[in-house]
Amino acid sequence: MNLIGCDFSSSPSKRKPIVVAVGHASAGRVQLQSLLRFDTLDAFADWLKQPQAWVGGFDLPFGLPRELVEHLQWPTDWLPCMQHYAGLTRAEIRDTFKAFCDARPVGGKFAHRATDTPAGSSPSMKWVNPPVAYMLHAGVPLLMAAGVTLPRLQVADPSRVALEAYPGLLARELIGNTSYKSDDKAKQTPERLIARKQLLQVLELGQTRLGLRLKLTHAQHDTLVDDASGDSLDAVLCMVQAAWAQAQHAAGDAYYGLPACDPLEGWIVSAPLPSA
């Protein structure tokens, strides 16, 4: 059983491809095996469909906020909602979501999922900074078409299990709000390089609440540190979250550590339950 972590892009290119970390776990140690890069959505879709066994963490939202869906009178079951959403253009998504936000007061423009606060994630309806609404629009249909299982959302091939991951959740636990990446070359500073080294050091020591130690070769360590965009490191963070989920499943949790949650919205793997 492989573990995968995916740093996704809704518009991949040779300059900024989709990055997939592949590894495996044993006795609390997570070993990185390889980093794969896909510069088109079609190439990534073909890889997803290959007959292989994996548990994966994908850095893209798997659902929309119920408040938004109900306001728009879209289907409130996950599958028909995603099918409806996939049929829209990006321009239609932007215009629809902008109109929703424009009608709401400052400080409450966006609707949120229940998982957003404990995970510290952006609302899945954001179309800019970051454009996670487009990531959902591009990525979830690929997972659906590939016939993978999405725990608490879609039951399909049990040998390929996809979970919504968020590298920022784990990164903040390890180094706080220190920035460790940037796509802007002018912001790819020595301070961010040091932060990537610190993040990897804590991962390799296993000093996280997930109880896992990352194992890297020297070459792999250098690759992750040298990628100033942080995409390779984010893929590895997602892989570690997938390893935690796999461990929960091995211990008897049929839902890979995901709590009972809104079956329209989904949940980010390893995000804590909100305080009562």
Regions found by a protein language model. Name each.
Residues M1-I4, F8-A276:
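RNase H-like (RuvC/DEDD) metal-dependent nuclease/polynucleotide-processing core
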